[in-house]
Amino acid sequence: MAGTTPVAFDPAPLHLGLVMTFTATTKVLAGQIVSHHATGVSRAVIPATNATAGALGVALHTAEAGELVSVAMNGSVVKIMLSTDDGTADAGDWIGVSTVAGCGVVRDAAIHAHEATAGLGNAIGIALDDIAAGASTVGGTGYILISISPPWTAVS
């Protein structure tokens, strides 16, 4: 399967919980999962990957670098996009952040049993829908309840 190409899409909020405005330090697309800027710049976000700082929420609109972007946070119900490499999700699955900027991935239930995989990052929330696979380079989209959890890490 070809790699995912992040695209802007309407996150179509069903419910907005906490919403805050941040500065995009690089281009952020509508619907992308965003995280703190890695350098610790105050109130600044970038598209999240499993290698960035903790996930904050989902961008409600596209913003160029230096522009303000509204971010749906805890308690919000919005659509996210899964990475095409990560396939599908079932309602009730925990969704984390993929290696693809701004995309989600199903969190393996074994993580709760202290899986020894590094770079697991935050869970962004819980899938409310079964999310079908996308087509070609665009992942499937579906609703999640944003419920940020702390980073899951391996325990020795």
Can you say where each PLM-predicted feature lies in the sequence?
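Glycine-anchored, exposed beta-strand/edge motif detector
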Residues: 2-156
